[in-house]
Amino acid sequence: MEMHNRNQSDLLPYEKLAILGIDREKADSLPMEVKEKLMAGEVTPIMQVSINARNGSIITMPMKLQMTTDKNGAPALIAYPVRAELNWERNKVLNLTQQEAERLARGEVIQKAVNVNGEKTQQYLQLDPETKSVIHRRVTDIKLEQRLKDMEKVNDIELGMQQKQQIREGKPVELNVGGEKVSVGIDLKEQQGFKIIK
């Protein structure tokens, strides 16, 4: 077990975590749940991080982290700071319209072409209610077609074309499975980016 933990720790993006004031010792002592979520590409629970400001002072703030890869496949770390509210005008990367911000605030998942690190890709966007930050993942990173096939096989149901299209657009679909109401759809807080809610 200890060996497994050590191997997993070796894969942590230490240089990226150090920017947030989490040195190797602190990273190794993170709770296992946090390390596992980081390694799996999931969004971590809220944690305190310290950042060196340009004026030399240290700013400590709560945020969630998520490990991903850049366009070259190198590890990258996304930080979702806790905010009082979604400030859609300040987020230049996502370039949200007021209408998109309102949809996110209502809990909707939206799909949008986003320019990240010079690469324009289709992304799913979802507002994290705890941090008021927008979580985003490439549409291609969420193996949606496979998730839908797996769900159909396991639950012995067949989704119609319209239902599949709704899910692709980020809208949840309510189904009746074995006499039980179930909602399925995109959830970027989940590792696989997809959730079945009973």
Predicted regions and their residues:
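Gram-negative host-targeted secretion-system effectors, predominantly Type III and Type IV
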Residues: 1-198
